[in-house]
Curated annotation (Swiss-Prot):
One of its GO terms (cellular component) is extracellular space. This is Somatotropin. PANTHER family: SOMATOTROPIN (PTHR11417:SF2), SOMATOTROPIN,PROLACTIN (PTHR11417). Transmembrane segments: none annotated. The modification Phosphoserine is found at S130. Plays an important role in growth control. Its major role in stimulating body growth is to stimulate the liver and other tissues to secrete IGF1. It stimulates both the differentiation and proliferation of myoblasts. It also stimulates amino acid uptake and protein synthesis in muscle and other tissues. The keyword Signal applies. Its main location: secreted. GO terms for molecular function: growth factor activity; growth hormone receptor binding; hormone activity; metal ion binding. Coiled coil: none annotated. The gene is GH1. It is found in: Secreted. Belongs to the somatotropin/prolactin family. Residues 1-25 form the signal peptide.
Amino acid sequence: MAPGMRVCLLLLIAFTLLGPQRAAAFPAMPLSSLFANAVLRAQHLHQLVADTYKEFERTYIPEAQRHSIQSTQTAFCFSETIPAPTGKDEAQQRSDVELLRFSLLLIQSWLSPVQFLSRVFTNSLVFGTSDRVYEKLRDLEEGIQALMQELEDGSSRGGLVLKTTYDKFDTNLRSDEALLKNYGLLSCFKKDLHKAETYLRVMECRRFVESSCAF
């Protein structure tokens, strides 16, 4: 055998033996960890937005008007027009892929308007986190997309296509109309994140929790 061919053969054998070691050194993240990470991200973001909503309400919306305003806020929510499950029981009737697609749809509908949060609310109002909400949304979006790739075997199948998004938050806080608009948007944001969190928890529970899913 020629010296050059002998060297190539030895290198091929070496790389073949090294392959399993490299794979063991950099294992793929288990599906359970992907779900756990996505659920934690959704819970954190949902709580952040819920706190922001409460603080905005306390600061700008008179208590006597809150009930009447809240009863009409559903009209603001574009997500009410899509066939997404409205609660845990309905979510349990859908497949994991369906729930992931709905979750992604809800998250992506807020990517554009959320970029205006830091222009609307002072840091003290949202506990210095308004600039990070967009980043947290993107992190959650990536987590959901990673789950979809795992469950769909890496294929990019067609799903729901988002054609509508929410309006931008209004920066004119001296206007009553703008205040009500922002109040409604925050309410929808909170509701949509609650839905996404619920879907992710339902999926995680029925895959990895043996007892009943109590949440």
